[in-house]
């Protein structure tokens, strides 16, 4: 039912508006019918390892690079040229992606996201409850629920701060970008100077359309 409604909504948008270009990545959870519809009505640009991108990709396994990561690095390359940039995306997973001042994408890291950590504690243990994310002030949990919140939330904060400190020690004058669905939840807890932008990925998608529409 959801797929049918989704298809109809896309169809209505295309019929009600003049749309010349469209772009598809794994961020949009596309299916075959949607792809066919977009191909018939627009110039469809598919994000893959063959796409024209605004940076040099030095990733050793280009075909396995996540499409959302490629889009985020494209956004950084266009918005902050001639800069060292670390993009931290707080989504289902937490991804770290680094692009150098020479406009070369080096790579980064992937770790479990906020909700994934809560679910893992519940799924892989016998007695720990499944909790919703909660902001906490104390690092020491005085009961089981607070201990889970402390472990998950503070664990991510320590991870991000430690990762940022490492990159700052290796690269001078680095810009730190925080984005993704959980960025607002965690941004105030992170000590390092960070530019937060929840639309960073959307800007990257738009840049790729402009670069590949000709």
Regions found by a protein language model. Give the residues of each.
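Nucleotide/phosphate-binding catalytic cleft detector across ATP-hydrolyzing
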Residues: 1-85, 104-214
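Short beta-strand scaffold segments in enzyme catalytic cores
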Residues: 94-99
């Amino acid at each position: 039912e959801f797929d049918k409604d989704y298809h109809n909504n896309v169809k209505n948008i295309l019929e009600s508006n003049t749309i010349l270009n469209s772009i598809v990545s794994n961020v949009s959870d596309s299916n075959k019918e949607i792809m066919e519809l977009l191909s018939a009505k627009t110039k469809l640009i598919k994000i893959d390892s063959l796409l024209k991108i605004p940076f040099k990709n030095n990733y050793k396994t280009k075909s396995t690079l996540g499409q959302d990561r490629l889009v985020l690095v494209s956004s950084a390359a266009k918005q902050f040229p001639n800069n060292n940039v670390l993009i931290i995306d707080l989504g289902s997973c937490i991804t770290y992606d680094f692009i150098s001042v020479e406009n070369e994408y080096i790579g980064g890291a992937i770790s479990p996201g906020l909700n994934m950590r809560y679910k893992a504690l519940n799924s892989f243990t016998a007695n720990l409850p499944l909790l919703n994310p909660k902001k906490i002030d104390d690092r020491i949990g005085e009961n089981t629920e607070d201990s889970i919140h402390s472990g998950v939330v503070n664990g991510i904060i320590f991870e991000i701060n430690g990762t940022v400190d490492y990159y700052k020690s290796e690269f001078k004058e680095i810009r730190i970008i925080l984005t993704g669905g959980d960025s607002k939840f965690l941004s105030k807890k992170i000590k390092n100077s960070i530019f937060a932008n929840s639309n960073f990925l959307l800007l990257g998608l738009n840049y790729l359309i402009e670069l590949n529409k000709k």
